């Protein structure tokens, strides 16, 4: 699932993997489940760890940690993104991804190739 950042947001128009910030006392999977509920209105069971990336965005250092969603319930809602789209990992390469997400997609695709 890719989510397009809204017009008033940082990196507006770029596509990203949904998620958000880890709050104090949360694990990464707990934070992702909470953020998916807040942003998309779904209840997600978080699966396997995919990888991590750091990206310098101006003065900010962005640290991303990607996890698979094993399953979810509920209907997707566009609460803070301008669009949502289901794509294969290969199709995702054709979208204008936020720069910090690009290495995570490449890592996921490489890992899938190794497991086949």
Model-flagged regions — what are they?
Residues 1-16:
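N-terminal strand-loop-strand
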Residues 2, 48-51:
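A structural microfeature
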Residues 8-10, 23-24, 70-74:
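Short, charged/polar surface micro-motifs in flexible loops or helix N-caps
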Residues 17-49, 88:
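The catalytic Nudix box helix
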Residues 43-44, 52-76, 85, 108:
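Active-site-adjacent beta-strand/loop module that shapes the phosphate/pyrophosphate-binding cleft
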Residues 66, 80, 103:
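Positively charged, solvent-exposed patches that mediate nucleic-acid binding
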Residues 74, 89-103:
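C-terminal structural segments of small proteins and small subunits
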Residues 100-116:
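Charged phosphate-binding loop/patch that engages nucleotide di/tri-phosphates or the phosphate backbone
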